[in-house]
Design a protein with these regions (language model features):
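Outer-membrane beta-barrel signature, preferentially recognizing the C-terminal barrel domain
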Residues: 1-24, 29-32, 37-64, 96-102, ...
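Outer-membrane beta-barrel translocator domains and adjoining extracellular loop/strand segments
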Residues: 35-43, 78, 82-90, 129-136, ...
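Structured loop/turn residues at beta-strand edges in well-structured enzyme cores
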Residues: 19, 67, 154
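Conserved C-terminal beta-signal and adjacent last beta-strands/turns
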Residues: 9, 95-196
Length: 196
């Protein structure tokens, strides 16, 4: 296969709302050629899609709101499509696979005192197409995550994380219309950090 080609144009701005809280904004357009995709007419075959673009806007916010409250979040709007018909399945005007129009995430950590902190986060992804033929749609989903932090002493911290708190069933990704991966069920892990 020929190598992929791309041209990216981007403009952005950053704002220090206060010394430890920053926001950023970026607008972009990415034009790509020779992009390898699975041919839905013959899933054992890879074809090159020569002509697609993505344009979008990204907003990010990260830092401390107060001494006890930290947050990190972002939102993205993306639009992308095939700009030239390549095959019976990769048709001009089709939306790109795996590209949600809207996605957002927000993570909050609040330190109750110097020993204990809690975290809560949300992840949202709008629906996406499994492939460039736009025949199979993976539905939108919203997932909640949580954490508890304990400072045992200045050098030792314990952390419990729970991902997919509500045990939401969702589809995370797809390699083709018939190779779709589910999102992970509720999972938890413990982490011990030692600083020396």
């Amino acid at each position: 296969l020929q190598p992929e080609r791309s041209v990216n144009r981007e403009i952005g701005a950053k704002w220090d709302i206060k010394p430890d809280l920053q926001a950023s904004l970026a607008l972009y357009r990415l034009d790509r050629g020779n992009v390898a995709v699975v041919d839905q007419a013959d899933v054992t075959r890879i074809i090159l899609v020569d002509g697609q673009y993505v344009r979008g806007i990204e907003l990010d916010l990260a830092g401390r709101v107060t001494d006890a409250w930290q947050l990190m979040g972002g939102y993205a709007y993306q639009a992308g499509e095939i700009t030239a018909t390549q095959s019976a399945t990769a048709i001009k005007g089709n939306r790109l696979a795996h590209l949600p129009k809207h996605s957002a995430s927000l993570w909050n950590r609040y330190d109750i005192n110097q020993t204990v902190g809690v975290g809560l986060g949300i992840v949202y992804r709008a629906s996406i197409f499994a492939n460039v033929d736009n025949l199979v749609t993976l539905p939108a989903f919203t997932r909640f995550d949580a954490a508890v932090y304990w400072t045992l002493n200045p050098a030792l911290q314990l952390q419990l994380n729970v991902e997919n708190l509500a045990n939401k069933h969702y589809f995370a990704s797809a390699n083709s219309n018939n190779n779709i991966s589910p999102g992970a069920p509720r999972s938890a892990w413990v982490k011990l950090n030692y600083h020396f």
